Each structure stands twice: as C-alpha cells, then as structure tokens.
Design a protein with these regions (language model features):
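Short, conserved glycine- and acidic-residue-centered signature motifs
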Residues: 83
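Nucleotide and nucleotide-moiety/phosphate-recognizing core
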Residues: 1-77, 88-99, 109-113, 128-158
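Active-site oxyanion-binding pockets that recognize sulfate/phosphate
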Residues: 123-127
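Short glycine-enriched, charge-decorated loop/helix-capping segments at active-site entrances
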Residues: 74-80, 118-122
Length: 158
C-alpha cells in the first residue's frame, strides 16, 4: 500500500473509513480509505474532507483505470470520471477539482467482462507490478507535496 513504507503510522476507523496519519518530512499526512462500496465512496470521502476542513484541490484520489496498460500511471487535476463509478460518486459530493492518480489495470477486452475484472484479485505478476507502483508513489510523495507532477511521474514510471 501507499503507507506501508512510512514510519510511525497511526491508524483509526472513523467517518466511514480507515484513516492513516503519518509525518512525511515536516508535513502531516492523512490518507483515507472508504469502507463504502466504490459507487458510494463519495459520501464518506466528503465526510472526511469536511471533518478535517480540507479543500478538494488538496486531495489526491488514487484509483484503477481500465483504459491504461497495467502499471502505467497518470496524474491529472479535475476532469471527467471517465465512466469510473467511484469518481462519479466523489464528483457528486465534492465536485471535480481534485487530483487523480490513475493506475492502469488493463481492459479485459469486452464490456461484459469489466465487472468481473475490476472485482477480481490481481494475478501474482500483476500484484507485483501494482505493489511496485505503490511503493514508488510512497517513496516520491514529496514531489506531490510540491505539486511537481512531471518529476513525480518520471520517478513513479521507472
């Protein structure tokens, strides 16, 4: 996971999800993983950012993307949900002005296979690839803190 490489992580269950708190350099970081179904996660994410008074433009949502090759990473600010039900839910609750870190999981080939594909576990080699990406994201958080998108992507894509 993104937080597994961090030291002194304090976790708690609150606001409909799991919150992890840790220091990254001089910054206090909070991560949130909703306990809701993907298509309803916007409700708990809205509770989280409202409770801590975060502005949406300080939020980074990390999500899977069928339209990207496995392990490919893209980052963007704002925009459409691209058909992703989790993003649709978030958009409906907090608007579209937040960062999205998209991690490719490959498209299964036909629309009929999409639900099964996104709900199934990764195969062994796929899991290794995704874990490597998460580790590189964790290692390079400082670039996100400084909004250095290009440098972040270069490091994460290695």
């Amino acid at each position: 996971t993104i937080i597994s490489g961090q030291k002194e992580v304090i976790t708690e269950k609150k606001l409909g999800g799991q919150i992890a708190n840790f220091k990254y350099g001089s910054k206090n970081i909070k991560t949130f993983k909703s306990n809701d179904f993907m298509n309803e996660c916007g409700v708990s994410i809205n509770k989280f950012i409202s409770f801590y008074k975060f502005k949406p433009d300080s939020i980074y949502v990390i999500h899977d993307d069928l339209d990207l090759q496995l392990g490919k990473v893209k980052i963007k600010f704002s925009g459409s949900s691209g058909g992703h039900n989790g993003l649709k839910s978030i958009d409906s609750m907090i608007g579209k002005d937040y960062f999205r870190i998209r991690i490719g999981i490959n498209h299964p080939g036909s629309k009929e296979l999409v639900n099964k594909h996104v709900l199934s576990n990764f195969k062994k080699q796929e899991l290794i690839t995704v874990n490597e990406i998460c580790e590189r994201i964790s290692t390079n958080l400082s670039m996100l803190m400084h909004r250095d998108k290009s440098k972040f992507l270069n490091k994460v894509k290695q």
